[in-house]
């Protein structure tokens, strides 16, 4: 039996989705321009051109809207990790690419984006949402580490869980420092973090020579 095809959404569902997206887009633009705390629900509704009460048909509060933005932000971050995994080159080069992309994404945003990023990370790790999102991010970084182990570029003596935690910690430290330090040299620190991690994870030259020697026997 052929799998059933779900029915196309009706006009009402399409309209609801359109309004939902307009509210998210309006909120993200206002948060970037003015900051999260300075933006009211009424201002979001005015920018989205909907009645104030319509907001609460979609979100219970501004914090609930932030949770959805946080989820979408995580989705984009997971895409960045996947892009880095699919590129050629070594694990070190993939780390350099990932951290460079993260820095570029953050720098392209407006100055108030720092507050938005801080709020979104906080929201994403609240008890109701954090466990699922934290597991997804941890799994994505773990996959990058395991790719390196499979390629013989990450030392077998390094616990992959520890490597994953170091990678995750470096990412969070980079984002938090950028969000809280006005003159933080984001691109330079991102590249330094990637180089450090790449070198720390790498198979030592002595181990590589020993492995090659066994292979020639």
Q: What is each model feature region?
A:
Residues 16, 20, 24, 66, ...:
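Amphipathic, non-transmembrane alpha-helical scaffold segments
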Residues 68, 79-109, 160, 164-167, ...:
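Hydrophobic alpha-helical connector segments
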Residues 76, 101, 105-109, 123, ...:
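Phosphate/oxyanion-binding loops and surfaces in catalytic or ligand/nucleic-acid-binding neighborhoods
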Residues 113-118, 149-195, 206-217:
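Hydrophobic/aromatic-rich alpha-helical bundle segments in the mid-to-C-terminal region
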Residues 1-34, 38-47, 64-67:
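Basic, helix-initiating cap at the start of DNA-binding domains
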Residues 33-37, 88, 109, 151:
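Short coil/turn segments at alpha/beta junctions that flank glycine-rich nucleotide-binding fingerprints
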Residues 103-143, 153:
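Short secondary-structure transition hinges
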Residues 49-59:
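Short hydrophobic/aromatic patch on the recognition helix
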